[in-house]
């Protein structure tokens, strides 16, 4: 029986409160290989120059909930077996992965390839893209979590590439948090330990991916979704990341250190180990293309 696969383009920017995420998503979808999978656009409220309203501790809460529901309606209408998501900020992952967990009887495996856990609310840093994995586990933000009909099992989740901040990064993050009054409601480590989620950093995975293979086997993962936040990559090697902003450093979390060949090998290995039914790629920030696009937008002869 043929499996039905759909691609979603969700250029959501409100979760990271950065309009550049929209262009990053569109370019990502354009770069992906062509095939016969339909590409469906999830409607997003475009940036109009008005700052997002902070509603109950989240910037753009209203828009984000509306966009989540729009994605859910599209997915439910198509009833796919597999979903590819091009984002956008990390919060775009909630609708497809929640659906896939329902589709596969609450037994979906999820590997979260990300420099950050996306489990924890940061008071004072009120952007929704810090919480998608928490929401999928039935925690995170209560209003978003209630849209997850069957929360993922913590034992079916593995966080790969989780960054450990360097001493210099720790100092910069601490200074930024103190200056802006930012504090986590609960530390990443506390949440990971409380829920019993397995993790591995990039260095460990460079030596061996045995921990992931064992997790797939021990947890009986038959269907797997892959979340890929491109910020797991080393910004010195791959420049299209929030952390590689040529004009302003990003000092709110540690940068990733994974190299692209390692990332590709990991995804290929996962595809051999089990049935990959979901892939979401997020947080693409192509600074050179963004700046060139802005330049072209200001040249008179191109705008007559």
Residue ranges and their predicted role:
Residues 115-116, 162-163, 231, 284:
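Histidine- and/or cysteine-centered catalytic micro-motif in compact active-site loops
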């Amino acid at each position: 029986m043929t499996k039905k696969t759909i691609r979603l383009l969700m250029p959501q920017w409100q979760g990271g409160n950065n309009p550049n995420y929209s262009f990053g998503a569109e370019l990502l979808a354009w770069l992906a290989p062509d095939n016969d999978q339909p590409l469906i656009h999830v409607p997003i409220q475009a940036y109009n120059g008005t700052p997002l309203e902070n509603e109950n501790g989240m910037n753009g809460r209203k828009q984000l909930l509306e966009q989540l529901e729009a994605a859910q309606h599209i997915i439910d209408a198509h009833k796919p077996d597999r979903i590819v998501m091009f984002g956008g900020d990390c919060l775009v992952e909630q609708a497809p992965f929640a659906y896939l967990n329902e589709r596969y009887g609450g037994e979906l495996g999820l590997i979260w390839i990300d420099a950050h856990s996306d489990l924890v609310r940061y008071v004072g840093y009120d952007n929704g893209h810090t919480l998608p994995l928490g929401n999928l586990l039935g925690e995170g933000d209560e209003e978003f979590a209630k849209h997850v009909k069957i929360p993922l099992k913590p034992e079916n989740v593995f966080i790969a590439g989780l960054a450990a901040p360097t001493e210099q990064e720790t100092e910069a993050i601490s200074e930024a948090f103190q200056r802006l009054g930012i504090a986590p409601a609960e530390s990443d480590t506390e949440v990971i330990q409380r829920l019993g989620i397995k993790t591995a950093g990039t260095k460990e995975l460079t030596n061996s991916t045995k921990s992931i293979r064992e997790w797939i086997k021990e947890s009986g993962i038959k269907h797997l979704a892959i979340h890929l936040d491109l910020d797991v990559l080393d910004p010195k090697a791959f420049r299209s990341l929030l952390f590689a902003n040529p004009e302003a450093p990003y000092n709110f979390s540690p940068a990733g250190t994974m190299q692209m060949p390692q990332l590709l090998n990991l995804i290929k290995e996962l595809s051999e180990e089990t049935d990959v039914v979901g892939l979401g790629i997020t947080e693409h920030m192509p600074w050179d293309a963004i700046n060139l696009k802005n330049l072209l937008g200001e040249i008179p002869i191109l705008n007559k």
